[in-house]
Amino acid sequence: MKKENFKEYTKNFNLKKIHTGSIWTEGPCYLKKFNKVVWSDIPNNRMLSFNFNKVEIFRAPSNFSNGNTIDNHGNLITCEHGARRVTTTDQNGIITLIADEYNEKRLNSPNDVCVHSNGTIFFTDPPYGIINPKRVEGFPGKMMYGGCNVFKHDP
């Protein structure tokens, strides 16, 4: 990323690298209650966090987590390629299932997620985490329905 490309947008551009050593990172989000940023390191099957002092492991294994976001209550919502599900982690660390199937068929490999201001959760479900055994981003599996899909979950 060239600093010159952004000069017209910001006068005090200050980009700092906070971590190296991951293979493929996705889904950074800020956990306000804990004043930290978490993200997924998919092939290493872990989630990392940065508390503005140091980077540490947040969750390992992470079920090859990918996209993350925060719901309207400050809980972490995570797409897990490996478990083929979407979960929420409350502020006490308790993980609860949001979705793992559609029409009684397993999800493919939930990927990205966002939450509407009314609490509705939207997530994508491509097959990437199950169809390519040479790429470590989940566990090989059978697609239960075709295509790349977007789902809506009303709480």
Residues covered by each model-derived region:
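Sequence-structural signature of mature extracellular/luminal beta-sheet repeat domains
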Residues: M1-P155
